[in-house]
Amino acid sequence: MNMKRLILPAVLAALLVSLGLVSNAQGSRPAPKASDTLVVNTTDLCRDVIGYDGPTPLKITVVKGVVAKVEALPNVETPRFFDLVLQSGLLKAVVGKTPAEAAKMPLDAVSGATYSSEAVIANLRAGLKEAAKR
């Protein structure tokens, strides 16, 4: 009984250590520190920016000073037209750039979804400018 109590923790410790070594050997990177990540939500920032049917807020994630992801937040735009904006690559165009660089990029409205895409571009620019300040 005493031998089992001694061996079990040792085996578990060895297993945990080996899992950590395997994880690092596979090139996994630790998650960025919270201080390395900035998230800008344009819901309040662009309250007066309206697409065809309403606001088109975005969530912009910046990691270590570079735009990592841009996501459209829930909105009331007609899905079939808003999907054109999402499929156009407009939100991905700024990924990999600093917020200041991305805010200055020329971005074109999407044909067939002009009002929605212009509102998304306005949200994107405002959010990027806000991120560049921080």
Task: Label the predicted regions.
Residues 2-9, 18-134:
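Flexible, solvent-exposed loop/hinge segments and secondary-structure transition points
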Residues 13-14:
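Repetitive helical segments and hydrophobic/amphipathic motifs
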